[in-house]
Every structure is written in C-alpha cells, then in structure tokens.
C-alpha cells in the first residue's frame, strides 16, 4: 500500500468549500465567488465527468477569474514608486465585529495580493508552492506577500475605524 492510499478522499462538499474560499480570495465578492465556482465545477464535470482534485478546481477558478478581469478590463496597474495610502471602507452594519473588519482590510489589497495571502495564510502553502500554482516566479510571490502585509498594516493603523479593529486584528496584521 503506498502513501497515496492512506490519504482520505476529499468530498465534493469540501472541494466546493475550498473553491468558494479561493474564489472569495480572488474576487472579494460572494456573488462572483459563487459564480466562479459554479462555472468551474460545470466546466470540469462536463469535460472530465467529475472534479478530480483541489488543484484542478483552483486552476479552473483562477483561469475563469482572469478571463472575467480581461473581459471587464478591471486589471489596475499601480505604480510601486509612491503608492497612495489605502482607504479602508467602513464595514457594513450587517458585518459587525472582526469579520467585517477583516473583510474591509482585505478589500484594500489587489487581487494578486489577496490570492497570495489566501494561499500562504489560509491554505498554508510555501512561496515555492504558490509560484507553481500561479505560474509566477518565487520572488514575485514573496514580493506580493510582503507588499500585502505592509498594506494591511497601514490600512489597519490608518483606518477611521481603528478602534473597531480591536487588538486581535492589529495582532494579526502586525505579526504576519
């Protein structure tokens, strides 16, 4: 019996949840994430009959997101020389507490930075693994992570809702 037989099979529900979390990291919108996962799932089941792995689902979701960005032309090029201070939107009243604060802070990141943060801190992947998944050089991934952490710190400290960002949130972004 080899090591591959020892790992439990991932269920469709777990795949969908992981795909949705990844879609949220890319799009930062519940509706777009749901649409991305649904379209990816449909494409994969039509083509292969089933979704074989998380990697295949993530790749399909990412490609669909890139296609949507190209169609909408929402890819923003930002100068890295003198970045503007990020403006953190005030969280909705429907999202009180830490969840709303984290969502607002992640909203200041570019999609590429959110993707790197998602893979590194939520999925527990190394920079090398992220570079293989996204097709970017390892140095670019490290730069994205570094810039994202700096932007999160600045946003958390300069937010008008900084007192709401309680000490847990400040601990999170200062310890990254």
Each predicted region: which residue ranges?
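Structural recognition of an alpha-helix C-terminal capping motif at a helix-to-coil junction
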Residues: 35-42, 51-63, 143
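C-terminal flanking helix
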Residues: 20, 41, 110, 114, ...
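Internal acidic/polar
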Residues: 67, 75-106, 126, 172-175
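A short pre-motif secondary-structure segment
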Residues: 116-120
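C-terminal edge and immediately downstream basic/flexible tail or linker adjoining helix-turn-helix-like DNA-binding
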Residues: 2-8, 149-176
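A short, charge-rich alpha-helical start-of-domain segment used by transcription regulators
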Residues: 1-21, 31-34, 45, 114
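Residues within the DNA-recognition helix of helix-turn-helix
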Residues: 15, 144-147
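Arg/Lys-rich amphipathic alpha helix in sigma70-family domain 2
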Residues: 52, 59-80, 95, 154
